[in-house]
Amino acid sequence: MVAERAGHQWCLFLDRDGVINRQVVGDYVRNWRQFEWLPGAARALKKLRAWAPYIVVVTNQQGVGAGLMSAVDVMVIHRHLQMQLASDGVLIDGFQVCPHHRSQRCGCRKPRPGLVLDWLGRHPDSEPLLSIVVGDSLSDLELAHNVAAAAGACASVQIGGASSGGVADASFDSLWEFAVAVGHARGERG
């Protein structure tokens, strides 16, 4: 999918809702009580951490822009997520959040590449050519395309059963299945 380059680091950019946790139908995950891990997601993050020097969550949280929750509410959710993962030795390197409503014309709302380009700009050892966007929606796959257009390359992985119409570089039913495939590609057994 992508090739190694000496001196540069892989970066895995993950969508949150629908990839790591269940989406709340017709609403937003407004607090930690509403956050529900998808099966195998925490285990997948641990497996992926062994391979990816950087794991960054990139998420649109338009509930903030709509006034349904605050930026602090989102930070608290991410702090709890980070603490649960840390208890198992897993670190998320960053949370890139667009708090704007879709009606606003910001540069950070996916599929615009602002959040990813911001991360890459602040981490010069991370390499767009070695970056992968993992998401469950067309906007995530378009994000990978837009990062590639701006930075030279970026692969896309779709999570979930819906067809991407051939837009994704690879598709898996879950984050866990993606992690297992990465492990197999790296020669891991089991």
From Swiss-Prot:
Its cofactor is Mg(2+); Zn(2+). The record marks 59, 110 as: Stabilizes the phosphoryl group. GO terms for molecular function: D-glycero-beta-D-manno-heptose 1,7-bisphosphate 7-phosphatase activity; magnesium ion binding; zinc ion binding. Coiled coil: none annotated. One of its GO terms (biological process) is carbohydrate metabolic process. Keywords: Carbohydrate metabolism, Cytoplasm, Hydrolase, Magnesium, Metal-binding, Zinc. Signal peptide: none annotated. Zn(2+) binds at residues 98, 100, 106, 108. Its EC number is 3.1.3.83. Substrate binds at residues 15-17, 23-28, 59-62, 109-110. The record marks 109 as: Contributes to substrate recognition. Disulfide bonds: none annotated. The active site is at residues 15, 17. It is found in: Cytoplasm. GO terms for cellular component: cytoplasm. InterPro entries: HAD-like_sf (IPR036412), HAD-SF_hydro_IIIA (IPR006549), HAD_sf (IPR023214), Heptose_bisP_phosphatase (IPR004446), Histidinol-phos (IPR006543). PANTHER family: D-GLYCERO-BETA-D-MANNO-HEPTOSE-1,7-BISPHOSPHATE 7-PHOSPHATASE (PTHR42891:SF1). Belongs to the GmhB family. NCBIfam families: HAD-SF-IIIA (TIGR01662), Histidinol-ppas (TIGR01656). This is D-glycero-alpha-D-manno-heptose-1,7-bisphosphate 7-phosphatase. It comes from Mycobacterium tuberculosis (strain ATCC 25618 / H37Rv).
